[in-house]
A protein has these predicted regions:
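Extracytoplasmic/secreted envelope proteins and their assembly/folding machinery
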Residues: 5, 15, 19, 59, ...
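A short helix->loop->beta-strand "cap" motif at the edges of active sites that frequently abuts
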Residues: 108-113, 167
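Serine-esterase "nucleophile elbow" of acetyl-processing enzymes
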Residues: 1-40, 44-47, 52-55, 62-70, ...
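Solvent-exposed loop/turn segments at secondary-structure junctions
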Residues: 7-10, 38-44, 73, 79-85, ...
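The substrate-binding groove and active-site-proximal loops of carbohydrate-active enzymes
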Residues: 51-52, 83-97, 141-151, 198
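Substrate-gating cap/lid alpha-helix
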Residues: 95, 124-172
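Conserved catalytic region of serine esterases and O-acyltransferases that act on ester linkages
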Residues: 165-170, 177-179, 184-288
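Short, solvent-exposed loop/turn and secondary-structure capping segments
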Residues: 12-16, 45-49, 86-90, 118-119, ...
Length: 288
C-alpha cells in the first residue's frame, strides 16, 4: 500500500494509527504500508505568491514512486494545499480536478486500486487573527481566506464524484467537520487543528478511525481521551509507529523530491532490513 499526501501525511501519525488498526483488526489482509507524504505538495500544481518556493507537485515524483513501490493499493489525501488558501474559483477547482484525473489514470495504468481521501477540515477559529475576507488583496498559507473550508467542501465533492470501480472515496472532510461541530457544542474553543491546517493528536486519531472504517474495519467505540493513552501503552503500537516513521524517512528521498532543494538517496536496503526485524517484533508482541 502506497500512501501519498502533503505535510499532514508526512507527519504520519494518522498513518501509524491506521497501520495499527490494520494489523490488529484485519491481520489477514497482510497490509504493508509505505507512506511518503511531502510537505506543501499539491495535485493542482498551484502555488500562492507568498509561498517561499514553488510548491511541489505530486506528478514530479509519482511515476518513480509507482515504479519503485509497485503498490496494489494507493491511498491519496490531497486538497488542503490545492486551493492555495484562496476563495473559491472555477480555475483552481479545475486544476484540482485535472490532478485527480491524472492520478486516477496513472494508478489504474499499473493495475492498482485507488482510495481517495477528502481533505481534513480547515479551522479558521483558532487563527482568526490572521485570516482574511474574500476582499483581501492577497491570500496564502500565512493569511488564508477565512472561509477556506468551504473551498475544501468543493474539493471533497469533486473527489466523491470520482467514485467508481477500483476508486474508493472516503469522505474524511465531512467526518471531521461533523465531529468538530459536535465538540463545539460543549466547548466552543475545541479544535482539531490549532494552526488551522495541521491536525493535533486527536485529529490524527479521528483521521485514522475514519479511514479504517471506510476500508471496512470494525473498530471498538472509544473516545480519544481513552484510546490515546491505551495506544501509547501498547508495545505493538510503539513498534508499528517506529517502523512507519523509519520507512517514511528512508523512502521519501529514495523516490526523490524537490521542495526548495532536490533530495535523492541511492538505496533503502539497510532500512528494509530494520523494517523486517521490527515486523518480526510486532508479530511476537501481537501473539502475546
Amino acid at each position: 500500500v502506497l500512501v501519498l499526501g502533503d505535510s499532514i501525511t508526512q507527519d504520519g501519525r494518522y498513518v501509524s494509527y491506521l497501520e495499527y488498526y490494520l494489523q490488529r483488526f484485519a491481520p489477514n489482509t497482510h497490509s504493508d504500508l509505505i507512506s511518503i507524504g511531502l510537505s506543501s505538495e499539491t495535485l493542482s500544481g498551484l502555488t500562492e505568491p507568498d509561498h517561499p518556493a514553488p510548491r511541489p507537485c505530486l506528478f514530479d515524483r509519482l511515476d518513480r514512486a509507482l515504479e519503485l513501490v509497485k503498490p496494489q493499493v494507493v491511498l491519496a489525501c490531497y486538497g488542503m494545499n490545492d486551493g492555495i488558501y484562496h476563495p473559491s474559483s472555477p480555475e483552481r477547482l479545475a486544476a484540482f480536478t485535472h490532478g485527480l484525473s491524472r492520478l486516477i489514470e496513472k494508478v489504474h495504468a499499473i493495475g492498482a486500486q485507488l482510495v481517495l481521501i477528502t481533505p481534513p477540515v480547515f479551522d479558521a477559529r483558532p487563527i482568526s487573527a490572521r485570516t482574511v475576507s474574500d476582499t483581501a488583496p492577497e491570500f496564502g498559507y500565512k493569511h488564508p481566506y477565512n472561509n477556506y473550508d468551504d473551498v475544501l467542501v468543493e474539493f471533497a465533492a469533486a473527489e466523491i464524484a470520482q467514485q467508481a470501480p477500483k476508486i474508493r472515496v472516503i469522505d474524511l472532510h465531512q467526518a471531521m467537520r461533523a465531529a468538530l461541530t459536535a465538540a463545539r457544542v460543549l466547548d466552543p474553543a475545541f479544535t482539531f487543528s490549532p494552526d488551522g491546517v495541521h491536525p493535533n493528536e486527536a485529529g490524527h486519531l479521528l483521521m485514522a478511525r475514519t479511514l479504517a472504517t471506510g476500508l471496512g474495519l470494525a473498530l471498538p467505540e472509544m473516545t480519544a481521551a481513552v484510546e490515546l493513552p491505551a495506544l501509547a501503552a501498547d508495545p505493538r503500537f510503539t513498534l508499528i509507529r517506529d517502523r512507519r516513521a523509519l520507512r517514511s524517512e528512508a523512502w521519501l528521498p529514495y523516490i526523490g523530491y524537490t521542495n526548495g532543494k532536490t533530495y535523492h538517496s541511492a538505496s533503502v536496503a539497510a532500512t528494509e532490513r530494520v523494517v523486517a526485524r521490527l515486523q518480526a517484533e510486532i508479530a511476537i508482541a501481537s501473539a502475546k
